[in-house]
Amino acid sequence: PDDSPMAATVDEKLRLSTTNNHTSAHLMHEALRQVLGEHVTQAGSLVNPDILRFDFTHFEKVSVEQLEEIENIVNSVIRDNIPTDIFETPFQEAIDSGITALFGEKYGDVVRVVKISDFSEELCGGCHVKATGQIGQFRVFSEE
């Protein structure tokens, strides 16, 4: 093995864009549940600096009106500039209190929770904004 020193840096611009999209995924998940119903669950996602793709379960195509309502809900939460609260708690306590977890995901005994006021509360280990106002305008470009 080579013992040469290495230097690593965080690309702040890349991190910020990815962080904005990641928190947006949480907001979109809850907006989908509010508009389409509590049966909606996340089935996958792609979060990168340029785009957010959110895969979810639902039994029919989402209408243009529903997409507009989802977009409006997310943008309202962004405009409200709600602080993001991140904390750790025992897994079973989180589940018992109704915090959203991904089905089939493996979690440890202690989990990290991302809470955005009373709007969204999910288990998550990713990077998030300090307050929703940092995200900027949210747009839905397509639904397939």
Role assignments for model-derived ranges:
Residues 1-144:
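A glycine- and charged-residue-rich anion-binding loop/surface
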